[in-house]
């Protein structure tokens, strides 16, 4: 990932924290962004997924607009399941590696870390498989995500 992309990702993360009115905390979003870049082999910058459709980015509601948005909805649901297990998915750090065929979780013994890593790896691979429709980026969610 290029340094400029990291700065953009950091700026997005900071603005999302401010917009959500929650105190700053360590997030695994940087790890998730690396998994996304690994899965799509750097073909699309991570920030393209931060405001896509009804579910990619902060929150989510309504009917997903396409396959990529369904990937984000599934990821949101996976994080919700992690929280039901007593995990903190946005704060869980884990060990992973990037192979030629995509990202994988590596040697994770703790249940919460493993669960969250699996959520993130599956989402990253789903993002890489799904078509990206520029028309679904930065949509009016109040109109399209009922």
UniProtKB/Swiss-Prot annotation:
Disulfide bonds join 38-98, 54-145, 56-72, 71-126, 78-119, 87-112, 105-117. Expressed by the venom gland. Keywords: Calcium, Disulfide bond, Hemostasis impairing toxin, Hydrolase, Lipid degradation, Lipid metabolism, Metal-binding, Platelet aggregation inhibiting toxin, Secreted, Signal, Toxin. It catalyses: a 1,2-diacyl-sn-glycero-3-phosphocholine + H2O = a 1-acyl-sn-glycero-3-phosphocholine + a fatty acid + H(+). Ca(2+) binds at residues 55, 57, 59, 76. SUPFAM superfamilies: Phospholipase A2, PLA2. The keyword Lipid metabolism applies. Residues 20-27 form a propeptide. One of its GO terms (cellular component) is extracellular region. Its main location: secreted. InterPro entries: PLipase_A2, PLipase_A2_Asp_AS, PLipase_A2_dom, PLipase_A2_dom_sf, PLipase_A2_His_AS. The active site is at residues 75, 120. It is found in: Secreted. One of its GO terms (molecular function) is toxin activity. Its EC number is 3.1.1.4. GO terms for biological process: arachidonate secretion; lipid catabolic process; phospholipid metabolic process. Residues 1-19 form the signal peptide. Its cofactor is Ca(2+). Pfam families: Phospholip_A2_1 (PF00068). Snake venom phospholipase A2 (PLA2) that inhibits collagen-induced platelet aggregation. PLA2 catalyzes the calcium-dependent hydrolysis of the 2-acyl groups in 3-sn-phosphoglycerides. Belongs to the phospholipase A2 family. Group I subfamily. D49 sub-subfamily. This is Acidic phospholipase A2 S4-30. It comes from Austrelaps superbus (Lowland copperhead snake).
């Amino acid at each position: 990932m290029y340094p400029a992309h990291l700065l953009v990702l950091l700026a997005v993360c900071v603005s999302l924290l401010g917009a959500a009115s929650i105190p700053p905390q360590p997030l695994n979003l940087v790890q998730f962004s690396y998994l996304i870049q690994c899965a799509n082999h750097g073909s699309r910058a991570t920030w393209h997924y931060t405001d896509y459709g009804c579910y990619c980015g902060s929150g989510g509601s309504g009917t997903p607009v396409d396959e990529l948005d369904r990937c984000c909805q599934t990821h949101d649901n996976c994080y919700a399941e992690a929280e039901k297990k007593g995990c903190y998915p946005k704060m869980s750090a884990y060990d992973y590696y990037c192979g030629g065929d995509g990202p994988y979780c590596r040697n994770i013994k703790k249940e919460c870390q493993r669960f969250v890593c699996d959520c993130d790896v599956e989402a990253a691979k789903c993002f890489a498989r799904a078509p990206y429709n520029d028309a679904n980026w930065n949509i009016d969610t109040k109109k399209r995500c009922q």
